[in-house]
């Protein structure tokens, strides 16, 4: 057995990839690892050169009008990573790495508004946005092992992230519109520090105790300026600046206790946290120097219990019962009240007062081990408190426009069944599949107009409580066909059934991907080919009647082929010291229209 202080080795990996449908997408990377005695050095470089087209339309039957969207993104990013692991002795390890990411992107957009019954009202918006940002990550880790197999240990990890970005956007308008052209300048500075202390102690062969402390400190400052984005009380477009300061500090502690009996095992846990959120949006009218401040604070203390029970009456049968409560906090993009994007008929903003959502889950599962695989069946119930979701409201300054934002819905409940399986019918064919069917009930506040938009007033906006009952299902299957030791083929299929929420009814989404892999040069090199969405069916379609009737569809470059080549070199098998995986517990924005 080689001890840590005598291990020597060098290895690396080179990757090249090219994807294409309408536009090329290229990526490459190289990573290397060198181990000499107590020191392990590693580094990598990767780049992505992407061009993407997105397009869609929204039709409004009440006025027989259509919005036609065309967007084009061109981005370049470079990621550099370097790190070192220092094995002081068999029990103590120090580790440090840094990531440096440089991004440069541009987006061009065009929105046409077409009124089929009154073409003289047709108008158009174009925009050009440039975005540059740099992000840095610095990570330190110290681990102390109390025994030879490292099962009893204490570990300290400190992670610090810095983000700085600048964006400038030019919006231009043509046709039947009185809206002036305007620019937008945005500067973003973000700092995130996370400190974790984890302790693991196997008290015996059948008992395990884990304890931990965590601090997460986050601050985000955005400075925004525009010469004609906002309107004053008289309806005049005015130059403004807005500063949005968002800070969130989280301090938490957790404990889990697990024990194995003859045929039973269980693990119970509890995490407690205290959270302090402070936000301030400060808008200045550059014509009058009038200042409007909107503060919002949210302090709370929460606990998150969990329990997992497993019963193994035999090698072929396993029963599981679990309960958990978790949190999904709003992402910074969801709480940012500054404009995300806009068209002549849509404006998208975050919601500064967005609350976190909490999910309580109960699951019961049964697993049957077969001669050629396994099958798992289960039932579940989930209750989501203050669910975060997209919301659509009527723009009070122009009742023909909508405001797209995020809101907390009332409690959402769902129950259903799940099936999953991995099975090998033959020595050359393996299958992994899953299916879930669930019933969901949502309750929230929504808005709608009771008369056509051309004659509507603010008094025609109805605010009402809406209940939506929905049954939905999802299916996915992955097949792998091994022709020889070096050649294999794959096929993946996905289907998401029709789905309904407070605002929209989403149409089914489905696609099929195929691929192949071929290894050569003594399995050191691998060539891969993937063809995604081979029938070109993947798209997002919806119908809605709040605040007024509309139907739409959005598409992207999903029907792509991909060529990849990778090559492993060197004789060593050493890798950088891994980090513990942690739950981000933050809900991401949609990143698009709906």
Label every PLM stretch briefly.
Residues 1-110, 127-164, 198-218, 256-258, ...:
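Membrane-proximal, glycine/serine-rich, low-complexity loop/turn segments characteristic
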Residues 15-17, 65-70, 121-128, 178-185, ...:
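Extracellular loop and loop/strand-boundary signature of outer-membrane beta-barrel proteins
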Residues 24-28, 74-78, 132-136, 189-193, ...:
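Residues that define the transmembrane beta-barrel architecture of outer-membrane proteins
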Residues 54-64, 107-121, 166-175, 222-230, ...:
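Outer-membrane beta-barrel translocator domains and adjoining extracellular loop/strand segments
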Residues 192-196, 238-242, 349-351, 355, ...:
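Outer membrane beta-barrel strand-and-loop segments of large Gram-negative receptors
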Residues 209-314, 447, 451:
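Signature of Gram-negative outer-membrane beta-barrel scaffolds
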Residues 409-413, 430-508, 513:
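C-terminal extracellular loops and terminal segments
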């Amino acid at each position: 057995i080689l001890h840590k202080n005598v291990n020597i080795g060098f290895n690396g990996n080179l990757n090249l990839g090219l994807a294409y449908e309408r536009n090329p997408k290229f990526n490459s990377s190289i990573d290397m690892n060198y181990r000499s005695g107590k020191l392990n050095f590693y580094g990598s470089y990767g780049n992505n050169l992407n061009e993407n087209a997105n397009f869609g339309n929204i039709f409004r039957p009440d006025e027989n009008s259509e919005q036609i969207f065309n967007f084009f993104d061109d981005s370049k990013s470079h990621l550099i990573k370097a790190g070192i692991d220092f094995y002081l002795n068999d029990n103590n390890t120090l580790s440090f790495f840094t990531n440096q990411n440089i991004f440069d992107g541009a987006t061009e957009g065009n929105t046409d508004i077409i009124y089929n019954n009154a073409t003289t009202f047709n108008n158009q918006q174009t925009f050009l946005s440039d975005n540059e940002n740099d992000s840095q990550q610095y990570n330190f880790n110290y681990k102390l092992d109390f025994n030879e197999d490292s099962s009893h240990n204490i570990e300290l990890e400190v992670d610090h992230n810095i983000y700085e970005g600048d964006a400038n956007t030019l919006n231009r308008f043509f046709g039947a519109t009185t809206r002036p052209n305007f620019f937008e300048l945005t500067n973003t500075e973000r700092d995130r520090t996370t400190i974790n202390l984890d302790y693991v102690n196997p008290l015996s062969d059948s008992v395990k105790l884990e304890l931990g402390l965590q601090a997460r400190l986050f601050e985000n400052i955005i400075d925004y300026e525009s010469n004609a984005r906002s309107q004053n009380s008289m309806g005049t477009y005015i130059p403004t600046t807005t500063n949005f300061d968002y800070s969130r500090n989280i301090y938490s502690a957790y404990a889990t206790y697990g024990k194995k009996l003859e045929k039973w095992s269980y693990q119970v846990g509890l995490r407690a946290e205290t959270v302090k959120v402070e936000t301030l949006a400060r808008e200045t009218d550059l014509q009058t120097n009038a200042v409007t401040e909107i503060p919002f604070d949210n302090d709370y203390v929460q606990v998150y219990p969990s329990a997992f029970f497993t019963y193994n009456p035999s090698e072929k049968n396993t029963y599981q019962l679990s309960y958990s409560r978790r949190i999904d906090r709003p992402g910074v993009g969801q709480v940012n009240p500054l404009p995300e994007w806009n068209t002549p008929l849509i404006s998208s903003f975050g919601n500064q007062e967005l609350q976190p959502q909490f999910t309580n889950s109960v699951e019961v599962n049964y697993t049957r081990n077969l001669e050629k695989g396994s099958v798992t069946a289960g039932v579940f119930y989930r209750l989501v408190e203050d669910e975060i979701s997209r919301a659509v409201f009527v723009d009070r300054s122009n009742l023909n426009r909508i405001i797209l934002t995020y809101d907390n819905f009332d409690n959402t409940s769902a129950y259903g069944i799940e099936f999953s399986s991995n099975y090998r019918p033959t020595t050359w064919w393996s299958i992994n599949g899953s299916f879930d069917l669930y019933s969901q009930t949502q309750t929230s506040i929504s808005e709608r107009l009771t008369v056509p938009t051309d004659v509507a007033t603010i008094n025609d906006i109805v605010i009402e409580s809406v209940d939506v009952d929905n049954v939905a299902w999802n299916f996915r299957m992955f097949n792998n066909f091994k022709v020889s030791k070096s050649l294999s083929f794959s096929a993946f299929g996905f289907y998401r059934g029709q789905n309904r929420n407070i605002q929209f009814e989403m149409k089914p989404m489905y696609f099929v991907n195929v691929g192949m892999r071929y290894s050569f040069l003594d399995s050191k090199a691998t060539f891969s080919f993937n063809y995604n969405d081979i029938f070109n069916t993947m798209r997002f379609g919806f119908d809605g009647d709040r605040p007024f009737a509309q139907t739409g569809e959005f598409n992207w470059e999903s029907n792509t082929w991909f060529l990849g080549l990778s090559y492993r070199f060197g004789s060593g098998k050493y890798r950088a010291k891994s980090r513990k995986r942690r739950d981000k517990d933050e809900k991401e924005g949609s990143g698009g229209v709906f």
